[in-house]
Amino acid sequence: MRFVDEVVIKLQAGKGGNGCVSFRREKYVPRGGPDGGDGGNGGSIYLKADENVNTLIDYRYKREYYAENGRPGEGRNCYGKAGEDLYLVVPVGTSVFDIDTNKKIGEVLQHGQTFKLVSGGKRGIGNTHFKSSTNQAPRKFTLGEEGEYKEVRLELNLLADVALLGLPNAGKSTLIRSVSEATPKVADYPFTTMYPHLGVVKVGVDSFVMADIPGVIEGAAEGAGLGLRFLKHLTRARCVLHVVDICPFSESDPVENYFAVEKELEKYSQELFDKPRFLVINKIDLLADKVEQKCQEFVEQIGYQGNYYTISAAMKKGTDELAKKLNEFLQKQE
C-alpha cells in the first residue's frame, strides 16, 4: 500500500431542517392551534483515530465530504430527523490544519479519539413555539441554518518511541527487521526505503515502537531527496538513533557522513536536534580486525560524548543488547 501522509480535503456539514407551519385539524376541534414541529439538526463531521489505519491514502482519491442534512419538521409537533454525523477514520497521530489560516486546529493521538471538524447547522423552529395570547394562529417559523464549511489539510506524524536516522544504506531497515517483525525492503542501493515503516520491539514483557524513515542526504532540510518530507515523523519520537555505516561500500568517510546528517537535522528543527539521541555504529562485521579500536577512534574523531552502541544488524550482533538499553531508557522516561 502506498504511504500517504498529507492530504487536503473539503468538508460540508449538514444543513438544519426547516421548522414547520401546521395547524391542528381534527373533527370537533374547529379552532385547533399550531402544531408545526421543529426540524432536525444537521450532521457534523468528525475525525476519528484508528490504530489499525496506517496511511491517509483513502483521502487522496476522494477529496469532498458531506454530512447528512436534517429533515424538516412536520405537523402534530413531529420533529424532523437529525442528519447523521460523518466520521473520517484516520491513523493515530493525525493533525488538522485550517487551509485559510494555515493554523493547526486539532489532532487525534489515541485510538478511538475524535475531533469535530465542522458543526452541523441548527434546526429550524416550528410555528408551535410562536403561539402567544395575542397570536393564537402564528404562521411564523424559522429556517434551518447552513452547516459549517471548511477546507483542511490532514498531516500524519507517526507516533514512535524510537526513530532511526541516517544516510541511505546505513542499515536502518536491516536494524528494524532484526529487532522487530517489520519487513521493510532491504537492498544495496540508496532509498530502498521509500516510506516510513513502524516495528514493535519486544523486550521481555515490555515493548516499544521503532520507526524507520528514508535516508537523509545533504540538503534534506531544504527538500533534497526524501528527507524533508519524512523528517517530520521524528518530531514525536521520544529518542533518535543515529545509525552510521562504519564501513560504507561507497568508500566515503564515516566521519563526514556523520556530520552531514547532524547538520541537516539541526537545520531542519532545533527542537528535533535537541531530542535525546544515541549513536549506533553499524556493519562492524565488515571490519577486518581491531573492531573495538576502530569504533573508538571513530567516536573520538566526531567528538561524541554520549553512550554509543556497536552492532551488525545483518548478523544480529549487538541488536538484542541495543533493544534492552533502549527499553531501559524509555522506562526511565515514563
UniProtKB/Swiss-Prot annotation:
Its cofactor is Mg(2+). It comes from the Bacteria. GO terms for molecular function: GTP binding; GTPase activity; magnesium ion binding. It is an enzyme of class 3 (hydrolase). GO terms for cellular component: cytoplasm. One of its GO terms (biological process) is ribosome biogenesis. Residues 1-159 form the Obg domain. The keyword Cytoplasm applies. Residues 160-331 form the OBG-type G domain. Keywords: Cytoplasm, GTP-binding, Hydrolase, Magnesium, Metal-binding, Nucleotide-binding. SUPFAM superfamilies: Obg GTP-binding protein N-terminal domain (SSF82051), P-loop containing nucleoside triphosphate hydrolases (SSF52540). It is found in: Cytoplasm. Mg(2+) binds at S173, T193. Coiled coil: none annotated. GTP binds at residues 166-173, 191-195, 212-215, 282-285, 312-314. Its EC number is 3.6.5.-. An essential GTPase which binds GTP, GDP and possibly (p)ppGpp with moderate affinity, with high nucleotide exchange rates and a fairly low GTP hydrolysis rate. Plays a role in control of the cell cycle, stress response, ribosome biogenesis and in those bacteria that undergo differentiation, in morphogenesis control. Monomer. PANTHER family: DEVELOPMENTALLY REGULATED GTP-BINDING PROTEIN-RELATED, MITOCHONDRIAL RIBOSOME-ASSOCIATED GTPASE 2. Belongs to the TRAFAC class OBG-HflX-like GTPase superfamily. OBG GTPase family. This is GTPase Obg.
